[in-house]
């Protein structure tokens, strides 16, 4: 069961890493979105006309996804390395994995809901996919961490 938990946490890292790399691969689409005028699929939102704010939000979200991936991979390794340890040692090894889940939820709540939806893409077609991705990462990470922390080893 302990190895399986490590695999689940590694999947959080892999998912977050894929999202971050996809963000970088889609930089041309981001350039078009930052340059889009209200009415080009966007509502006239608080910061919709600010390219600097758009790029800052993009960089912050992408950086956060890389951080989540790194913390999740560390958590997965810690869990795997402690798979034969005592219960107390294994509980300590869960720390980074739990942080990965917490950071995923923070990414969803703070970055996607507040920055992405609240300031830029709220109510637009462009924002729907970003919100869905963030929700999927946050909710699956939370469920994984509940499993890792709550299911008996």
Where in this protein do the model-derived segments appear?
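Membrane-interface interhelical connector segments
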Residues: 27-53
């Amino acid at each position: 069961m302990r190895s399986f938990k490590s695999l689940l946490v590694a999947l959080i890292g892999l998912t977050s890493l894929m999202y971050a790399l996809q963000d970088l691969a889609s930089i041309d689409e981001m350039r078009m979105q930052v340059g889009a005028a209200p009415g080009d699929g966007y509502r006239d939102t608080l910061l919709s006309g600010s390219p600097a704010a758009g790029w800052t939000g993009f960089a912050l979200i992408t950086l956060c996804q890389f951080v989540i991936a790194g913390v999740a991979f560390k958590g997965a390794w810690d869990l795997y390395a402690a798979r034969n340890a005592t219960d107390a040692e294994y509980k300590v090894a869960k720390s980074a994995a739990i942080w990965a889940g917490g950071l995923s939820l923070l990414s969803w709540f703070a970055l996607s809901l507040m920055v992405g939806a609240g300031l830029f893409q709220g109510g637009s077609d462009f924002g729907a996919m970003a919100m869905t991705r963030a929700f999927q990462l946050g909710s699956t990470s939370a469920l994984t961490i509940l499993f890792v922390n709550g299911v008996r080893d």
